[in-house]
A protein has these predicted regions:
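Short helix-to-coil transition segments within interhelical loops
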Residues: 39-44, 81-82, 141, 151-170, ...
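C-terminal transmembrane helix and the adjacent membrane-cytosol boundary/short C-terminal tail
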Residues: 127, 173-181, 222-271
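Generic hydrophobic transmembrane alpha-helix motif, especially the helices
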Residues: 36, 40, 70, 80-81, ...
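Transmembrane alpha-helix signature in integral membrane proteins
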Residues: 46-81, 235
Length: 271
């Protein structure tokens, strides 16, 4: 399901029957053989805009997820392994950021720095980092007590090398789960920001923007709103389902017993 939506987003611009910005039909025109999803509020082909409106959303969501995972994992591993004052500083910072809902935190950064696309990606990515850091810290606290970590320390391995070579490889499972969850959240948040006007400037096609632009004509041509909304829903649900399936298969088949126990310790809400 999610793969089908991804396929639509990737090859959509190639197979689009019209330019996404061309005025080719009537305002909120009903679906027809020539325009299967009708027209939007300016008379542009809804199908063409749907086909062109997903690729940048996916790219931005993937980039934001990568930022959140990298920053969050680095913070979580450092806090758990180094402990002491550094652990306190990192986790108190995490607690402060987590006091704000993700969308509010992203909006705060964008209102201060401006709604540029790279800033949207950065803001959403940083909003993911605290939750990732908390999960990875919990997992690292357990791994840091394992024998192979203690052996590396006795051999004189530097802390940075211990974290990179001994701890990080054993966090693959929780990182995979977090990446899937954060990708789902990234899609929803970025689409929501586009709906609120923080996205590609008009007349660029974007699924979130399309919902906002065409909601005034919902009774005239509901497909102008339904089509992008359904694609966003299918993508998020499919991504979440796929992540859950991968986590269960990975824990049950390929991972060592200690990794399975580690993810179980994280709780059902993280698995």
């Amino acid at each position: 399901m999610a793969l089908l939506v991804v396929l639509v987003a990737v090859i959509g611009p190639v197979v689009s029957p019209h330019s996404p910005n061309a005025l080719v039909t009537l305002t909120f025109a009903k679906p027809s053989s020539q325009f299967p999803l009708g027209g939007d509020f300016l008379g542009r082909d809804v199908l063409s805009r749907v086909l062109n409106g997903g690729w940048l959303l996916l790219l931005m969501a993937a980039a934001a997820t990568a930022i959140g995972i990298v920053v969050g994992a680095a913070a979580g591993i450092s806090a758990a392994y180094l402990r002491g004052a550094r652990d306190g500083i990192i986790m108190r910072t995490v607690d402060v950021i987590l006091a704000f809902p993700q969308l509010v935190f992203a909006l705060l950064l964008l209102s201060l720095l401006g709604p540029k696309l790279w800033l949207i990606v950065l803001a959403v990515g940083l909003s993911h980092a605290p939750a990732v850091a908390r999960v990875i810290r919990s997992a690292t606290l357990d791994i840091a007590e394992r024998d192979y970590v203690k052996v590396a320390e006795l051999q004189g391995m530097r802390p940075a090398k211990v974290m990179a070579k001994e701890i990080l490889p054993n966090l693959v499972t929780p990182l995979m789960v977090e990446a899937g969850l954060r990708l789902t959240y990234s899609i929803v948040i970025i689409a929501g920001l586009a709906f609120l006007g923080f996205g590609q400037p008009p007349p660029a096609a974007n699924w979130g923007t399309m919902i906002n632009e065409n909601r005034i004509g919902l009774q005239l041509n509901p497909w102008a709103v339904i089509a992008p909304a359904v694609l966003i829903a299918l993508l998020t649900i499919g991504t979440n389902t796929f992540t859950d399936a991968v986590a269960r298969v990975t824990i049950g088949v390929d991972r060592r017993p200690e990794e399975a126990a580690l993810l179980d310790d994280l709780g059902p809400e993280q698995a």
